């Protein structure tokens, strides 16, 4: 729709490195490529993961960043949001799921989804923190995932099945009701075996694309 920002999704497959820090290593490289005024909003599901990412990044790289999660007071969250909004403030804001509720960050143009909810409405809510009137640039959405894992299953399902990263989904709950159980089983199977159930997964993608 004219007047609304465009979205561009970048799915980033990560090969297991044996250290268990694949997402942090990729995120560190992304930060190194930022220009001084670039802003990145990162959203993940829990405050524990936010705190873990914060600790890991402080070891790996010197970058101005803030946190935003439910155990912070309202004043603390306001200060973090304000610091992120300043031109010379934080380049990276690490948010738990609460960061996708009620706050708008349309001055940022990069969104990192370090994990994905099995809920298209919640995914849209996350993206909506940047996809607002007043957004002046194409929104770059980064979705890193471990190869041959449940992360890959859900990331590709959203992208190849629903096109949910680049287009607004108004009835995503119907897809979850129809395919959520099957997707969850395939995700668990991939995590347990370290291999993708390709035939069954390709069939799921085809059914998802054909579903109305």
Label each region the model flagged.
Residues 63-97:
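Conserved helicase ATPase core of P-loop NTP-dependent helicases/translocases
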Residues 44-69:
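Conserved helicase motor "Helicase C" RecA-like lobe of SF1/SF2 P-loop NTPases
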Residues 51-54, 93-109, 127-135:
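SF2 helicase motor core recognition
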Residues 119-141:
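Conserved SF2 helicase motif VI
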Residues 14-45:
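Conserved interdomain hinge at the start of the Helicase C-terminal
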Residues 137-212:
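C-terminal accessory region of SF2 helicases/translocases
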Residues 1-20:
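Interdomain linker/hinge connecting the two RecA-like lobes of the SF2 helicase core
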Residues 103-115, 140-143:
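A short beta-strand element within the Helicase C-terminal
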């Amino acid at each position: 729709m004219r007047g609304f920002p465009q979205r561009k999704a970048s799915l980033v497959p990560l090969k297991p490195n044996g250290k268990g820090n694949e997402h942090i290593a990729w995120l560190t490289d992304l930060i190194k490529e930022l220009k001084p005024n670039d802003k990145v909003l990162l959203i993940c599901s829990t405050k524990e993961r936010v705190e873990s990412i914060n600790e890991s990044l402080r070891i790996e790289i010197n970058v101005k960043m803030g946190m935003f999660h439910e155990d912070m007071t309202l004043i603390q969250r306001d200060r973090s949001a304000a610091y992120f909004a300043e031109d010379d403030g934080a380049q990276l804001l690490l948010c738990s799921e609460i960061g996708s509720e009620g706050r708008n960050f349309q001055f940022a143009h990069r969104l990192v989804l370090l994990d994905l909810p099995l809920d298209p409405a919640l995914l849209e809510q996350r993206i909506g923190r940047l996809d607002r009137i007043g957004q002046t640039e194409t929104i770059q959405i980064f979705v890193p995932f471990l190869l041959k894992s449940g992360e890959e299953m859900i990331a590709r399902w959203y992208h190849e099945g629903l096109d949910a990263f680049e287009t607004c989904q108004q009835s995503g709950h119907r897809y979850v009701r129809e395919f959520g159980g099957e997707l969850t089983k395939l995700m668990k199977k991939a995590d347990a075996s370290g291999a993708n159930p390709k035939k069954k997964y390709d069939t799921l993608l085809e059914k998802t694309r054909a579903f109305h």
